[in-house]
Amino acid sequence: MSPSVSSPQLRHTKSNRAISRIDRTDPLALALQPPANEAPADKYARLHQEKLAKQRSDEIDKFLKQHQEDRATHGLASSPSTSVDGANFKKGRVYKMVLLGQAGAGKTTVLKQMRLLYDPPAHERERRGWTKIVLLNLTSSVRVLLETLSLYHDQRLERKSSELSRLESSTSASTSTSASASSPKHVDTESQPNDATRLELAKQLGTTKKINTSSLPWLTHIPSVVQLERALRTELGAFGEEAVLSASSDEAAITNQKVRTRLDAQGSSSIRGEKSPLVLRPGWQERLFTYARRSLSLTQNGRAAAARRETDGGDSQSESEKDNSETLKLLRAIRPEVLALWNDDAGCRALRKRGLFLDGQSDAATSYFLDNYSRITDAAYRPTDEDILHSRVRTLGVTEDVFRVDRSLIYRIYDVGGSRSQRAAWAPFLDDIESIIFLAPLSAFDQPLVEDCSTNRLADTFTLFNQIVTNPLLEHATMILFLNKIDLLEKKLRQGVQLHKYWPEYVGDNDFEAVWRWFRAKFRDALRRAEDEVNLDQTSRRRLYVHTTVATSTVQIRAILMSVKDSILRENLKLTGLVG
């Protein structure tokens, strides 16, 4: 008699046999089968991501089903056009769009604006979840301010030390020459070092020739702010956190030297690379906003219980408030000194005049958050739309959103990561795309690409645009171009940053209107050349819809999105032959 097999073992054996049968007959099942040696932690992570993806898919299906029922209720399902060509009708009803552009161009900000316009309830549900991200952006801005001013004072110290050494060596050389001279010679007293100047420099430098922390007490806050930022990033699940904020001493020295060089450069308009972007792992929206909604529900439904706990001396704070309390405690403690630096410090004013804290120059809108420091750290703080729009979170991978624009139009929008390393992942999402919104940050005309410091950011944008308009898969897609960060471009030009210094082919005036129109013409020429290469006739040529944008301006983007909708309608009518 064969040995008995326990029930769990039998079920496991049958399961493996079933999988083997499926694998032999179904290539898709073979491709999707998890690794045989999958670790428990990897399995848990995979199942969690599959669960989130399934929930998202079910939500979209429910949304589309509800929309179809609404159409049937209004008698639209039986219209001749839908019954004759249901596929084309569905294609026109669910309109596929993709947001393209390099990292930091403003794609995610535009997507936030779309959610605010087309799905206000979802935007409102997520509002509470942005609190921690806003606090992280504020913390990063504080660190940027303190470290930049530290380097500024360090640079001044180096200059004074160099000047003192020069004066001392000059005095020594003069004394030696006078003592060894065999006959008296005329001495130029005007070229002699000024003793008063030398004494003043020596007094300022002191014996250590280091920054006097007693005169700059805010320097002592830098380690605690760095530690707080690291903790917030870790809590949010920032990608690559160890590589970002744990640089070696050699790397830190190199970074400091680069910043010193930029501080010393005349006409420099930004400090680049002073902070790393907040790159969160895939699924951060579900984790953060689901937690925020749960906390909000607990807060709303448990007010009576909270009041009782408070009466009994218990802690009445919600989970979210507890998590943020330590952050707020530190930010409130250093607030007076930071605001005094930001508003009154002479060195900070000098750097601000040179544009070193210009919003959009880095991944944090530094000046925006510092200007709103007091409001954000208030006890009754609640993120505003402006706070959410200015908060920077870099997209990792691809996110998909579905918005009902009106009864007959739904946008399915893909937001893809724009860094060079992520562009290879775009291809699967470009199939059957009907419209492309391409964002070009014009204010980056004088900035290097983060991934390659030898490449100009805007030059990389033109290269990317050329690759898109020459892609055969996208030859029928409507092209919509957002010339973004136009306000920062105007500020730079007014501050005297010369375009021809970075773009020698530009020969016009350093005038805002002339500059942005010149860039618009370059994009149009790029599209025209791409179509000339494939010998398109005049009737088949695409129109490039161009808009100058400030992605954080809700009023402007709302008007532009309405214009985009009209452009889409116009292109659809053209395809049906109803318009020429």
From Swiss-Prot:
InterPro entries referenced in this protein's UniProt entry, alphabetically: Gprotein_alpha_su (IPR001019), GproteinA_insert (IPR011025), P-loop_NTPase (IPR027417)
Bias-annotated ranges (Polar residues): 1-10
Binding site for GTP: 101-108, 389-395, 415-419, 484-487, 551
Residue numbers spanned by region G1 motif: 96-109
Keywords: GTP-binding, Magnesium, Metal-binding, Nucleotide-binding, Transducer
Low complexity bias spans: 167-183
PROSITE patterns to which the protein is assigned, alphabetical: G_ALPHA
Residues bound to Mg(2+): 395
Annotated segments matching region G4 motif: 480-487
Region (G3 motif): 411-420
Keyword Magnesium recorded: yes
MF terms in GO: G protein-coupled receptor binding; G-protein beta/gamma-subunit complex binding; GTP binding; GTPase activity; metal ion binding
Residue span(s) of domain G-alpha: 93-579
Region (G2 motif): 387-395
An annotated GO BP: adenylate cyclase-modulating G protein-coupled receptor signaling pathway
Family statement: Belongs to the G-alpha family.
Name under which the protein is recorded: Guanine nucleotide-binding protein alpha-4 subunit
